[in-house]
Amino acid sequence: MLTTFLNSLMMAMTMVTMTAPAQPQMTTVATAIDSNPNKASKDASDPRAYLNEIDGDKAMTWVEAHNLSTVDKLSKDPRYSEYQADALTILQATDRIASPSFARDGMIDNFWQDGTHVQGLWRRTTWESYRSGNPQWRTILDVDALSKAEGKTWVFEGGDCLPPTSNLCLIRLSDGGKDADVVREFDIAKGEFVKEGFVLPEGKQSVTWVDENTIYVTREWTPGEVTSSGYAYVTKVVKRGQSLDQAVEIFRGQKKDVSAERGVLRDIDGKYVMDTSYRGLDFFNTELAFYPNGHPDTRKVVLPLPTTAVFSGYYKGQAIYWLKSDWTSAKGTVFHNGAIIAFDLKAALADPARVEPLVLFMPNEHQSVAGTTQTKNRLVLSILSNVTSEVRSFDFGKGGWSSFKLALPENSTLSLTSSDDESDQLFVFSEGFLEPSTLFCADAATGQVEKITSTPARFDAGGLQAQQFWATSKDGTKVPYFLVARKDVKLDGTNPTILYAYGGFQIPMQPSYSAVLGKLWLEKGGAYALANIRGGGEFGPKWHDAGLKTNRQRVYDDFQAVAQDLIAKKVTSTPHLGIMGGSNGGLLMGVQMIQRPDLWNAVVIQVPLLDMVNFTRMSAGASWQAEYGSPDDPVEGAFLRSISPYHNVKAGVAYPEPFFETSTKDDRVGPVHARKMAALFEDMGLPFYYYENIEGGHAAAANLQEHARRYALEYIYMFQKLMDNK
């Protein structure tokens, strides 16, 4: 569907980065330095408070000085130019797969970036032309030309197109990659922005079509009218031709919510079904309300389901939910955590107390649901089994629910890319660590699967193999991980190894084909490990819940267990072991550097959280309390202080020299965590690398050239720390 294409276009590229090491030996631990990191951001007693001013002159002078120092040190390595060129060649390759998305009337859309189109092209072709292998594209929007004309670095972030024709789209453009964006109405048929069309100024906002002349807008209508997480919670109706100050309020959440908004439920044909409203009570609990009588009726119905249940679609009159906790219906039926359930929505709204779902799919202890999508007549689930994928097609009829497995590659990572709401076709990508991405088109009704194209191999994988192993964590839990290394790897403890993980927010880490990793690291003798630690979504909600709040040390223990297993197997050893992670994974890296400095010789800390005492007062941090806990709660706050990297740097400890990476335009986590941690290291006389991309948002890069530069810096760092010492 076109709306799906636009909403998912700008998936952040997987970040692969590293840092420089200090001495691996553990020395005598002294008392923690008194750095006042627990002070509020405006506290004058904090010697690093000036770094809170994102674009402040003093802060940016500090940033620019460290950027220059880091680039100067790493780019002098004679390998740097080659690595940057190799990375850019891979990222801009013209023979890579143009990721397709179904549009209306048999058309295929794609968003494309290369050396000429740095910010990108939104373009379209026919299905017949696309599958020919030499598609003839028509440009819909040239983001580079728009950026040049307006003096901006526009990052295209998708949008929302009005069904059934999908000609009118509300396009989101971000200046430099921030979460905040501007919204403009665009006419695809004419290839231009609508004159005097809908326009919303920059903000963290959401917008939904009601009809051709009406939209729902949720934004910060008056200064300060946002939740404690910094998101809007008031929705107003905006009519065509109205100014924003003429908009009429239709819905208001609560300031304590993470976010809230009024929306619209449509069927697969794009027809209006009813209004909905959403309140994010916290990151994992929501109140979803339905308005059976439509707009402007304010009578709402909240179904008696757990607030952890996730609404996953509307299919043939059935509401599809994913249960994240056990639930007992009014009849006493127990529905278990992880199940996909369905029930007649209109019947449920007429008599909410009598909701009695059917179970579509109940994962076993080794499985989890990775995603759902719909075609014209089928519901499709992506399922993980021991971190490998399968795809099943479901149908609902007089006999209830039935399903079959699509004949896609085994032991691969399968990604549901786009589905067609005018047929039963869907695009599926298949890939593995050593298997380049292959695009399939599957028919969810007949089960027919057609290979469309594959990415050429970008590195020599002939002598490599990928294996899955299991480590035993501190509490006895078995934790899986993948290891990619040479088939003839010498188990002598000297193999340079990068260990990556995320471990949070129920996000699973799966094998994927990273051409940059392969070319710059694996092909040159490096090994790579991916840890499926608790906190992620590899084995469903329970695997995630096991690492929440004060149980989060389990996540960190799991990661350490994988590292120790690699060392015990003599795959690697501390002088040759580096770790990397971004965002929540950046917090993971910070914790590992502080808790076990004796295990690592390199640590890459990307767009991280690091101050866990003050994170709720930084950027969107308040929205993550359901994951991490509240610093204001006595028990949770004490735990957060005990694991907060910023609060546990100690004098007299030989830490590995870290590589901190962030972005000035990151308005989700923000650059302050990384800035102040690096400044703390600086104040203590500890060595570190620091690089802050001026553009890029939470993805830390706004275009392919910036990604290539970042990769080159990271891998030079890794080579110097892990390979050059062999």
UniProtKB/Swiss-Prot annotation:
Q: Name one GO biological process term.
A: proteolysis
Supply the SUPFAM superfamilies for this chain: alpha/beta-Hydrolases, Peptidase/esterase 'gauge' domain
* Single GO MF annotation: oligopeptidase activity
Annotated keywords: Hydrolase, Plasmid, Protease, Serine protease
Which InterPro entries does the UniProt record give? AB_hydrolase_fold, Pept_S9A_N, Peptidase_S9_cat, Peptidase_S9A, Prolyl_oligopep/macrocyclase
Q: What class of enzyme is it?
A: hydrolase
User: Is this entry keyworded Protease?
Assistant: yes
Q: Which residues form the active site?
A: 583 (charge relay system), 698 (charge relay system)
Transmembrane regions listed in the UniProt entry: none
PANTHER family under this entry? PROLYL ENDOPEPTIDASE (PTHR42881:SF13)
This protein's name: Uncharacterized peptidase y4nA
Name the species this protein comes from.
Sinorhizobium fredii (strain NBRC 101917 / NGR234)
